């Protein structure tokens, strides 16, 4: 079905096509025709962060920024859906156009800039959702006009608002589309921010009588020294998990494309190699008690297996859905299932 719709969607501006695709998924859900878009995968229960995921394939943050399509997305067969990034106050994001397809490379460049309706709107949407079929992650960020020195207050506010509703919370400090945000990944800044948020997490756990895991999402553009420093901080502070990775600002593999000079984060197939290297290095540097989610460049079941081989417990798709459609979900689940059933038992590949 998606192969028939794709030529029309690709004739539209990328952001307009994005909105239309979400409306179509909603329509299919309301009319009970989601099965025409994707066959729901057979469950593949997967433990991580003290939770049990129906299957290890999730939706990465950014597709449903405001939590307006949760039930329709679960109906496609995701084991978990991550909504956001959400900020304390609504913001429009960067000027349009701000999303670009690179079909020759099965890639996307975006500079959305955390456009969202604000955390209160997201909370209202989550409260209305039925949420059957999977676990819900909520990705939080800071407003663009909040300085890095004051960033903790934005993250804390969002965490307090979404904590009762989230199955896990992701702290996004790695988007390239908010000026200065990635500076929060520097060792001392990271330690201050995550230390404060761990204290908030523990206080909220006592207040609500449940512990919601807190994950940190990192960039693929960190050098080995920065990765090692981040791993030390995240291990010292005992975060619940790490998502590797966000989009990249490098253009090496798409340098000849006419859109390569567009500002923003590059995602899709060209990101697979670098994001998986970061994932593998983090797995080698972090204790086994901190699971990883692998994301970046997954366009096939084999790509998902590569993430698992590099040390991921779960994987997420986003740009791959633009090119492959919802069938990618089941393909990834089935490929991971075959890997689990293999005699090797799915050992992590060495550095």
From Swiss-Prot:
Binds 1 FMN per subunit. One of its GO terms (molecular function) is dihydroorotate dehydrogenase (quinone) activity. Substrate binds at residues 65, 110-114, 172, 177, 246-247. CDD domains: DHOD_2_like (cd04738). FMN binds at residues 61-65, 85, 139, 172, 217, 245, 268, 297, 318-319. HAMAP family: DHO_dh_type2. Monomer. This is Dihydroorotate dehydrogenase (quinone). It is a peripheral membrane protein. Keywords: Cell membrane, Flavoprotein, FMN, Membrane, Oxidoreductase, Pyrimidine biosynthesis. Belongs to the dihydroorotate dehydrogenase family. Type 2 subfamily. Pfam families: DHO_dh. GO terms for biological process: 'de novo' pyrimidine nucleobase biosynthetic process; 'de novo' UMP biosynthetic process. The gene is pyrD. Its EC number is 1.3.5.2. SUPFAM superfamilies: FMN-linked oxidoreductases. The active site is at residue 175. It is an enzyme of class 1 (oxidoreductase). InterPro entries: Aldolase_TIM, DHO_dehydrogenase, Dihydroorotate_DH_1_2, Dihydroorotate_DH_2, Dihydroorotate_DH_cat, Dihydroorotate_DH_CS. It catalyses: (S)-dihydroorotate + a quinone = orotate + a quinol. The keyword Membrane applies. It is found in: Cell membrane. The keyword Flavoprotein applies.
């Amino acid at each position: 079905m998606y192969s028939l719709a794709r030529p029309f969607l690709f004739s539209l501006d990328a952001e307009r096509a994005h909105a239309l695709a979400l409306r179509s998924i909603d329509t299919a859900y309301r009319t009970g025709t989601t099965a025409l878009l994707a066959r729901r995968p057979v469950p593949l229960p997967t433990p991580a962060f003290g939770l049990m995921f129906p299957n290890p394939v999730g939706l990465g943050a950014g597709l449903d920024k405001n939590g307006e399509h949760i039930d329709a997305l679960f109906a496609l067969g995701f084991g978990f859906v991550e909504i956001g990034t959400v900020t304390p106050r609504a913001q429009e994001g960067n000027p349009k156009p701000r999303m670009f397809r690179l079909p020759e490379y099965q890639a996307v460049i975006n500079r959305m800039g955390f456009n969202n309706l604000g955390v209160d709107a997201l909370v209202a949407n989550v409260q209305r959702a039925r949420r059957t079929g999977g676990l819900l992650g909520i990705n939080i960020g800071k407003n663009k006009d909040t300085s890095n020195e004051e960033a903790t207050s934005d993250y804390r506010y969002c965490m307090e608002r979404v904590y009762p509703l989230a199955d896990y919370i992701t702290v996004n400090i790695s988007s390239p589309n908010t000026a200065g945000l990635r500076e929060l990944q520097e060792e001392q800044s990271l330690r201050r921010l995550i230390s404060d948020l761990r204290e908030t997490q523990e206080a909220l756990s006592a207040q609500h009588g449940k512990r919601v895991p807190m994950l940190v999402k990192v960039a693929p553009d960190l050098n080995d020294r920065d990765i090692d420093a981040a791993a030390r901080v995240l291990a010292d502070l005992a975060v619940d998990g790490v998502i590797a990775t966000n989009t990249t600002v490098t253009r090496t593999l798409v340098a000849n494309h006419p859109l390569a000079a567009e500002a923003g984060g590059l995602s899709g197939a060209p990101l697979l190699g670098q994001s998986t290297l970061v994932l593998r290095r983090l797995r080698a540097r972090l204790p086994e008690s901190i699971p990883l989610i692998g994301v970046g460049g997954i366009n096939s079941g084999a790509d998902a297996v590569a993430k698992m081989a590099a040390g991921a417990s779960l994987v997420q798709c986003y740009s791959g859905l633009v090119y492959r459609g919802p069938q990618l979900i089941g393909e990834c689940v089935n490929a991971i299932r075959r890997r689990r059933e293999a005699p090797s038992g799915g050992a992590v590949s060495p550095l």
